[in-house]
Design a protein with these regions (language model features):
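C-terminal beta-strand-loop-alpha-helix "lid" module of Rossmann-like NAD(P)-dependent dehydrogenases
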Residues: 1-294
């Protein structure tokens, strides 16, 4: 049985841990709000961009573009968007479990985030590029990833490019998913609003009558495709950061709550042990007094 000194030492240790997790919770909460606002603010633009792309595709007729060329998939590139740090619950575990479903023998890996890089190295998979991005992702960072993916596809090194990331749904819910990027015909249409994640469905040619294109839709589409891909990657980075900070805030709150409960339990155990020691001492004193009286 532990002594009162051991319990006091453990209570002090847990209190110190609770202070750390509480501070991390507050930092994550501040970052979470900013990241969530950025992710949600980008969704209306992403939705409108899809509508424009669908309308331009309808107006372009038989449109041909190197980024839309469909080939037999012999080699695939998988872009993994992970976190740099841990302490965010099962977020990275779920993400990498989804990435592991892609057959590694026919896949090369592009990573953004240290956790993904460590996983690729640990599992001895083929890494072709590693990127990093800030807590507030910049469009230039997304463009660098997108440009590299386009170069892989256009050079014929890969026949398809997918991205696996954690999609932000709400503060308590984040979902790891694989989204196709190239060829462009495999892009998903995202219908989203500011209050929810939206739904994904295949991008289909829309009604060109809603838009008037100058110059011709085909010419515009050729210039629009690279920007469209850049923004898709940028939105993925925003969703990943919103998911990371939300998961970390929830994890740190849970850790703080658990620490507080543990402190209560230890304090109760300490008081019981202290009371037992006092009772034992009183009994010894009483027994000694009675023995001396006799």
């Amino acid at each position: 049985m532990p002594s009162t000194r051991d319990i006091r030492r453990r209570i002090k240790s847990v209190k110190n841990t609770a202070q750390i997790t509480k501070a991390m919770q507050m930092v994550a909460s501040a970052k979470m709000r900013k990241a969530q606002q950025a992710a949600l603010a980008g969704r209306p633009y992403a939705t409108l961009m899809n509508e424009v792309m669908a309308a331009a595709t309808a107006g372009a007729g038989e449109f041909q573009h190197p980024l839309a060329e469909k080939r037999e998939v012999k080699k695939r590139a998988l872009i993994i968007i992970s976190t740099d740090k841990g302490l965010c619950g099962a977020l990275n575990t779920n993400l990498l479990r989804e990435a592991a479903k892609v057959p590694p023998a026919t896949t090369v890996y592009v990573v953004a985030g240290r956790k993904a890089a460590q996983w690729v190295a640990r599992t001895k998979r083929e890494l072709v590029a590693e990127f990093s991005f800030k807590d507030s992702p910049q469009f230039a960072e997304a463009r660098a990833i997108s440009k590299f993916a386009q170069e892989l596809f256009l050079s014929g090194q890969v026949d398809a490019v997918d991205v696996v990331f954690t999609n932000y749904i709400n503060t308590l819910t984040q979902k790891a998913e694989v989204r196709p990027l190239l060829p462009m015909g495999r892009i998903k249409k995202l219908e989203a609003n500011l209050s929810g994640p939206g739904t994904s469905e295949d991008l289909q040619p829309g009604s060109a009558s809603e838009f008037s294109f100058e110059p011709a839709a085909g010419q515009l589409l050729g210039n629009l495709l690279p920007h469209y891909l850049n923004f898709q990657v940028y939105q993925v980075l925003l969703e990943a950061k919103a998911s990371e900070h939300s998961a970390r805030m929830v994890a740190m709150k849970s850790a703080t709550d658990n620490a507080k409960q543990l402190i209560k339990d230890l304090t109760l155990e300490y008081n019981k042990l202290r009371q037992a020691n006092i009772t034992k001492e009183l009994l010894e004193i009483t027994s000694a007094a009675m023995a001396m009286g006799n």
